């Protein structure tokens, strides 16, 4: 799988073959704006966790098209991570992650080029069901969390102090 990073007028393509490579990728994105993150209300770790949830959701549900029922069945069987890593290695889709910093905010845009989802409903039911917990975490992490109409592009915004 390829992840395309757009940051500071640079386009970088990174090959990812394992879900464990996501955390270092997030650190790379965040470290490219090392001064900006320190000016935010949220902690570095909290933002890292929120971004991780959004990127993993983009991989699972957007790029791979993994449905919630199958995901939880794989988790119950203890085969989720192996399944996910196998699919990631075979995946031809890419995900775009763009980090945009201004005087007032840092915005991370994640585009999975998938079919999208009904994000308004998903955010509403996330508080009461197992489905959507990652979205609920992200919603509580960022000052603004929005999606395009079909739900395949996410905008996560952190305002500066």
For the regions a language model picked out, list residue spans one by one.
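Short, function-defining helix-loop hinge/capping sites that tune catalysis or transport
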Residues: 65, 119-120, 142
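Hydrophobic alpha-helical segments and their boundary regions
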Residues: 46-47, 51, 103, 123, ...
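Flexible, glycine-/charge-rich segments associated with ATP-binding catalytic modules
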Residues: 1-20, 104-108, 115-116, 128, ...
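Bergerat-fold GHKL ATPase/HATPase_c domain
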Residues: 1-52, 60-76
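Glycine-rich/acidic phosphate-handling loop/turn and adjacent ATP-lid/helix
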Residues: 69-132
């Amino acid at each position: 799988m390829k992840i395309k990073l757009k940051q500071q007028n640079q386009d970088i393509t990174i090959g990812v073959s394992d879900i464990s490579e996501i955390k270092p990728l997030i650190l790379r994105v965040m470290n490219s704006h090392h001064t900006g993150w320190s000016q935010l209300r949220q902690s570095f770790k909290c933002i890292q966790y929120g971004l991780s949830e959004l990127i993993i959701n983009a991989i699972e549900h957007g790029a791979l098209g993994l449905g919630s029922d199958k995901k939880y069945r794989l988790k119950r069987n203890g085969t989720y991570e192996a399944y996910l890593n196998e699919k990631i290695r075979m995946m031809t889709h890419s995900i775009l992650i763009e980090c945009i910093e201004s005087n007032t905010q840092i915005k991370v845009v994640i585009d999975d080029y998938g079919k999208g989802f009904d994000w308004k409903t998903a955010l509403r039911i996330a508080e009461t069901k197992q489905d959507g917990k990652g979205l609920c975490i992200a919603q509580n992490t960022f000052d603004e969390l929005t999606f395009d109409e079909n739900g395949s592009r996410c905008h996560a915004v952190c305002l500066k102090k």
